[in-house]
Every structure is written in C-alpha cells, then in structure tokens.
Amino acid sequence: MNKSVKKKIKDEINVIVTNLALSNNIKLDNININIQKPPKSDLGDISILMFEIGKTLKLPIEIISEEIIKNLKTKYEIKAVGPYLNIKISRKEYINNTIQMVNTQKDTYGTSKYLDNKKIILEFSSPNTNKPLHVGHLRNDVIGESLSRILKAVGAKITKINLINDRGVHICKSMLAYKKFGNGITPEKAFKKGDHLIGDFYVKYNKYSQENENAEKEIQDLLLLWEQKDVSTIELWKKLNKWAIEGIKETYEITNTSFDKIYLESEIFKIGKNVVLEGLEKGFCYKREDGAICIDLPSDSDEKADTKVKQKVLIRSNGTSIYLTQDLGNIAVRTKEFNFEEMIYVVGSEQIQHFKSLFFVAEKLGLSKNKKLIHLSHGMVNLVDGKMKSREGNVIDADNLISNLIELIIPEMTQKIENKESAKKNALNIALGAIHYYLLKSAIHKDIVFNKKESLSFTGNSGPYIQYVGARINSILEKYKALSIPVMEKIDFELLKHEKEWEIIKIISELEENIINAAKDLNPSILTSYSYSLAKHFSTYYQEVKVIDTNNINLTAARIEFLKAILQTIKNCMYLLNIPYMLKM
C-alpha cells in the first residue's frame, strides 16, 4: 500500500481519535498510529494495531475501534478483529491511480524528496594500483554504485569519490619485481590489460620475498628513492601506475561503475600532516620526547572506554604519517571542496577499528563538526576454500569472473541470436546481472561465498531471473503492438478483477516506501527482495491469465497497461541495483 494512502488513513484516524479524546477530557501530546500489513490478504489491505492508541487514551480498544468504524465505514470496508482494525480500500480507484501514476512518471516512479538535497559523499572502490580488481572490489563497487542511485532517488545530492591508492610499500613490491623480472614487457607485448600485468609482478614479488631475506630491505630502499623523487624510480612508478589505472578504469566501464571525483593518494597524502600540526597548535595532540605527534584514543579493551586511553601516533618521529593521518587530510579536502553533510565510506569489515579511530580523531580535531561520518562495513567475498589472498595469486579477478560467466552463457545466446556481437553483449549483460544481484542480495555485513551456478539461475532468486521477467513482459507488449489494435480512448481498469492483479498492484505501489527504507538502512538488499517478489508474482499471474485476448479488447487493453506498470517498476529497480535491462533474452 503506498505512502499517500497510508498517510490519508492515518490522518483520518488521528482526527477521530483526537476528537474522542477531547470529548472525554483526555489531554493528548502524541498519538502513535501503528499501520501494518495484515498477515493474510483476505483480512484486509491495512491493519491498525489498537493497543498503543488504547494505552494513550486510557480507554478500552473496543470503544476506540467502534468510534473509528462509525466515522470511516462509508469510505472503507473496516472490521475489528481482536486488537486490530482491518481496512479494505476501494480497489477500483486504487488500481486506476497506481497504473496511471507509474505509466505517467515512468523512470521517476518511486522517487521522492525524503532526503531533500542533503549533500552526501560516497567513497567506494579505492583500489591499489598493484593488482586488478577482484570479486571483493565488485561487491564494494556495486554496493557503492547502487547506494548512490538509491540515495539520489530519495532526493540526496550525491558525490561519488574514488581514492586510488597509488603509493606506498605495496606499490613498491610490484615495482621491484618489474625491475628484476620485467625485461621491458608491456601490456601490449603481453596481450594483457595493464592491471593484470602489474598483478602478475605483485605475485612474483611474493615468491621472490620467500626466497630472499633481503627483499624487505630492497622495498624500503625503493620507497626511500621514491620519497626522494629519484628520476628513474618516479618514471617506473608513473609507467606502472598508468598501466594499472587504465586497466582498472576499463573494468569500471564494463561494470557500469562511475565516479564524480577520482583522487590519487600520491597527490594529497601530505595534507593530513598539516591538519595534525594544526591540532598540535590547538592542544588537541601532543608531542612525545622522540618527536612523534600523538593523540589519546579511548581503549577498546574495556567496557568503560571513556575512562581509559591508548596512545595513537599520527606523525612518526621520522616525520612520516600513517593512513589515519592521510584520511584526516582527505576529510579536510572534501569539506572545502564539497561542503558535505554526510560522508559514507564503503569499506570492508577488516577496517572497522581504523574508522572508529578516524572518526574519534576527526571529532577531536573539529573536522567532523556538523557532519556525519559513516563506515558502511561490508563482509568479505570468499573462495570455496577460504579468504582471497592476492599476493599468492589465489584470487577471483573481477575481469576473469565476468569472462568466465560469459563463457557459460554464450552457447545459449548464440543459439538464440545469430549476430555474434549481439550475443556477446547479451551474455555480458546477463553476467553483470548475475554478479551484481548476487553480491547485493545478502545482508551487507555478511561474508559470502560466490556461487556461479546459483548466480546464473533463470528460475531462482537471481539477477538473470529478474532480467528474464523484464524481457518476457517486453515481448508480450511487442506482440500486442504488432496486432495493431486501435488505441482505446479510455481504459477501464475496473475490469482488472483477478486477485493476483490486486496483489501485484499493492506491490507496485510500495516501490517508493521500499526505496526510502533501502536509503534509511543503506541496504540495497531491500530492493533485491522487492524485485524478486514482484517478478515471482508476475510469473504466477502470467500462468493463470490470458493477457492478450482479441475477443475481449477492453480487458486486454487494461491488462496491457497493467503490464506496462509492472515492467516500469521492475526496470526502475534494476537501474537502482545496477542490473542491465534487456529487451530480449
């Protein structure tokens, strides 16, 4: 049931209850009218739990229910059942209004002004330039991309940020391996994307370090040369980073992931030191005898965290900074550049402690004044035999996973589509639908094991199933269009009397509420569940009714408009979940 109908009924009951209170000399501050969905559709469309109202008025719920029924019985079919008031609304008006609304608003159906231009930054992806994106990045990226679309749909002004980690020890590992084993190889010569080539050298370094005790010192020496801006070292660093970033951007393009601003860590990492030095001047930090600049953090080892502290070094005694310090600088930069109200970091659960410390220090230094900082922690994506480790080469690369799924799909596509390019494009879209839906349908905080077979199912809770239902509805609409039946001047939606039609209309009308809930909870899985429910209901409906009946063009016209509304709702959900819509499958 859509929000406007719920609000209307809620307002009407509020007036009745307020008048009842006045007539009984009862003072009311606030009335909590709890609207619920009945457990069974035959009970009604809306249920009101009367306990809270009875408690507020200090009157028997039977008396309150009787008063509400007396005042609303001309508008609704309403019945008291125990502690509930069950209400059935006018189907004719509701069906007509819902279908007209969806088919008029089209792509904007389900949007709202819930967050009303709130300025929100979403930081996600943040890859290292020493390896290609893996399936863990795919989860991070689709969460970030989907949430950005969901938050925009409820009225927020979104800035999507990607901080690429292009410096440090981990980057030097690939550089050292390339110096030793590269022999002038390039992505073109290797017939590889640049990020994959760099990833190969990251794995080579790991093997090299296991056999050479001096490897760690070589890395530190190389890092020192980089910091001293040694010409040949900087040239190598720029060349390898360019290859890696070009490859990573190709993957973003394939997966329909985009950013409003991309930062390179090498360009901004020093800003955090200035922020800390300002904090030192203001007395928020202190300097140790060895010259290190520190701040005291609440200890996580005791329940009374505010009574005990632990020392956190922000700038080391040698003048170098830690990642937390660099992130403080990032907050300062983004405040100046975007003047945001809220910043959401989409980062894996292994970084929970880092963000606890970051947010505490940011507050102490006054960086987060009038701002909300959120760490949206997501679980890991594992291999069947455990956690991925890229330094060992035991990892599902994002590109390889997509290619692998395409290979599984392409034989079926080539049977249906003669044009090879079209078949490959369709296979890619199905692969993306499979991956994105699978990575979004679980609770964000949970670790998951990616199951290729399950992700590609055309019958279960999967992306390809949602895509198939969308394509199926489109084919029905195309079939109807080909019949060249004259356009009806007025559609009689009162003809839609099948119980499944009513159930589907109620689901369609709840899109806005589901989008708002997904935005509130920062949880795209609310929309995967919603999409799956709508798709399943349509499939059952289509098995039970004949949509196109040339002997009954009035009913057919009503059902065609009904299907248009279903398809539009599914398409809007697919966009929010970054799942490609397909005309044919």
From Swiss-Prot:
Keyword terms, alphabetized:
Aminoacyl-tRNA synthetase, ATP-binding, Cytoplasm, Ligase, Nucleotide-binding, Protein biosynthesis
Which cysteine pairs are joined by S-S bonds?
none
Q: Which reaction does it catalyse?
A: tRNA(Arg) + L-arginine + ATP = L-arginyl-tRNA(Arg) + AMP + diphosphate
Where mainly found?
A: cytoplasm
What's the superkingdom here?
Answer: Bacteria
Pfam families recorded: Arg_tRNA_synt_N, DALR_1, tRNA-synt_1d
- Give start-end ranges for motif 'HIGH' region: 127-137
- GO MF terms, alphabetically ordered: arginine-tRNA ligase activity; ATP binding
Q: Which GO terms describe its cellular component?
A: cytosol
For biological process, the GO terms are: arginyl-tRNA aminoacylation
For this protein, the Enzyme Commission number is 6.1.1.19
Q: Which family does it belong to?
A: Belongs to the class-I aminoacyl-tRNA synthetase family.
Q: How does it assemble?
A: Monomer.
What name does UniProt use for this protein? Arginine--tRNA ligase
